[in-house]
Amino acid sequence: LERLDLNKPVMITEGPIDSLFLDNAIALAGADADIKINHEQCTMIFDNEPRNKEIVNRMINAVDKNFNLVVWPKTLRYKDINDIIISGKTSAEIQTLISNNTHSGLTALQHINNWKRI
């Protein structure tokens, strides 16, 4: 938490290793924490597991709590940010991928419905 700048947008990843590759990021490590910062300044980044009911439900819950949410493109073959790094992509490329796939509100719910496979 000491490396977070709460005056900037915050990225919240599912896994601690994933958070190491992003600017101003922390990890929930599978927990459903009640974050004490403005949810609208946070972007939740879950693993790319469209068949995982728990992840889909947590994504919907994050949108209901006014978090921004990354919904990975269907063409992405990797499970998480760490896998994307291993594939040879840079942190900057991942930041762009995240920016291009961040949604909120009804738009996020629509993207979740198109992404999920359950």
What is the predicted function of each stretch?
Residues 1-2:
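Charged, flexible boundary elements
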